[in-house]
Amino acid sequence: MGLKVNVSAIFMAVLLTLQTPTGQIHWGNLSKIGVVGIGSASYKVMTRSSHQSLVIKLMPNITLLNNCTRVEIAEYRRLLRTVLEPIRDALNAMTQNIRPVQSVASSRRHKRFAGVVLAGAALGVATAAQITAGIALHQSMLNSQAIDNLRASLETTNQAIEAIRQAGQEMILAVQGVQDYINNELIPSMNQLSCDLIGQKLGLKLLRYYTEILSLFGPSLRDPISAEISIQALSYALGGDINKVLEKLGYSGGDLLGILESRGIKARITHVDTESYFIVLSIAYPTLSEIKGVIVHRLEGVSYNIGSQEWYTTVPKYVATQGYLISNFDESSCTFMPEGTVCSQNALYPMSPLLQECLRGSTKSCARTLVSGSFGNRFILSQGNLIANCASILCKCYTTGTIINQDPDKILTYIAADHCPVVEVNGVTIQVGSRRYPDAVYLHRIDLGPPISLERLDVGTNLGNAIAKLEDAKELLESSDQILRSMKGLSSTSIVYILIAVCLGGLIGIPALICCCRGRCNKKGEQVGMSRPGLKPDLTGTSKSYVRSL
């Protein structure tokens, strides 16, 4: 009974093993051809951004300092106009060519808002990015009544960060970089300092703030419509107090670092006021959505030797797995962190079936190419083991001082603590751990993939040869087509005449051939009869040598 139970248990274990999915990356087989994984992370995508307005007030409230700072304020206003007027003119030129599109309802005959349209004829030349930014600019613009209310509110406040709620609008933040200095230092010291000294201090502070604003909005002077401002540059102009601004915006969470590193928070200028000297920006701060089940893997390759030739396996730098599916991964729009991978857009795209077979462990499906020039990786540390191409670089056991040789029938050398605890490879000393990879991988036990060329000259040469062969094949096909067309051009009557002529020739030629054969046979019979003598000579008493000569 116990034997039956054990047999059943073994059978079930084998069955479960056979049903285990094999769609993930086969790191064991890939390591045999020098491909290892150096990290995996979750996959997060930025979703639709939330927009909120931010007002930067460039002119501080100096009601109590008017008598001492008139000259400095006049000079500061002149500098601000040189910065703000070009931006204002560009914004006006774009927004004047964008008007709302209104549709008329068929039932009630009244207009309703349908969207915006860009007057391209009046605008002239504009790039696609400028047109898209212009539409977004129109959609985020404040109306004239809101601008007037905002101007009145800013003229009465003297707080560095003031939250102002507009009717029908989102929360607006008014930020002024010099107001704290005026409130906390200049006004309390009015009785101790002279009027000239107060004016000089305020002038220096305003000049410094002007320099910061100029560095912040420098790209906007060249392209105020589509140039975007990162939150890092905005934090510099706000005195580095980015936490207070983000707190007022209502943004928090563990993904803040990922958004900042991926430059996900953007700000675009939507309004410039040259009367009260303030700028309105539309800030877009996205939220992150983690795609469940998707894991992003980073791959690295090590070159290996086959005889005197050095090869490496051609695999993508990043791939993604989701269940059985393996996909390519475009890392151009992504930021990689220990917490995960953050991308501004979807980075997954399909992978060829042959490359999927390669990553699943079929080494014969992995293409390889010759190493040209200096190749980056001839050794790599993975899971505490050193995978090195000791046929191309010097590998030395630092513990014993001996050279680690790589046999010609091995393509790579796997060094662990049981072989050498401390290894010196290419001048770098590395302490390795316990063995995680096999001691050696022999060439005759691996099915290598097809060799390919990635060099531009070689690819061009191969492509030229392929084109030449295609042209030759095309000429042969054209000649065969001509023969077929000539055969098709013959009429059925002509074909019948040709067959009749062939038959008549055969009827005449066959009897003549038979007669010729009979005549030759008769002549041969006559010649044989003439060559036979009637009497044989008497050879009695003749020597043997004479007989042999006969």
Curated annotation (Swiss-Prot):
Q: Which residues lie on this side of the membrane: Cytoplasmic?
A: 519-550
Renumbered residue ranges of the record's region Fusion peptide: 113-138
Q: Does the keyword Lyase apply?
A: no
Effect noted on mutating residue 262 to N: Hyperfusogenic
Membrane-spanning residues where? 488-518
Q: Write out the ranges of the annotated region (HRC).
A: 69-95
PTM summary: The inactive precursor F0 is glycosylated and proteolytically cleaved into F1 and F2 to be functionally active. The cleavage is mediated by host furin during the transport and maturation of the polypeptide.
Q: What is the effect of changing residue 465 to S?
A: Hyperfusogenic
Annotated phenotype, changing residue 461 to W: Hyperfusogenic
Sorted alphabetically, which keywords does the UniProt record give?
Answer: Cleavage on pair of basic residues, Coiled coil, Disulfide bond, Fusion of virus membrane with host cell membrane, Fusion of virus membrane with host membrane, Glycoprotein, Host cell membrane, Host membrane, Membrane, Signal, Transmembrane, Transmembrane helix, Viral envelope protein, Viral penetration into host cytoplasm, Virion, Virus entry into host cell
Acyltransferase: present as a keyword of the record?
Answer: no
A GO cellular component term found in this entry reads:
virion membrane
Q: What is the effect of changing residue 360 to A?
A: Greatly reduced fusion function. No effect on F0 processing
**What quaternary structure, including any partners, is listed in this protein's UniProt entry?**
Homotrimer of disulfide-linked F1-F2.
- Read off the domain note: Contains 3 heptad repreat regions, HRA, HRB and HRC.
Which family is this sequence assigned to?
Answer: Belongs to the paramyxoviruses fusion glycoprotein family.
Q: What is this protein called?
A: Fusion glycoprotein F0
Write down the species: Measles virus (strain Ichinose-B95a)
Q: Which gene encodes it?
A: F
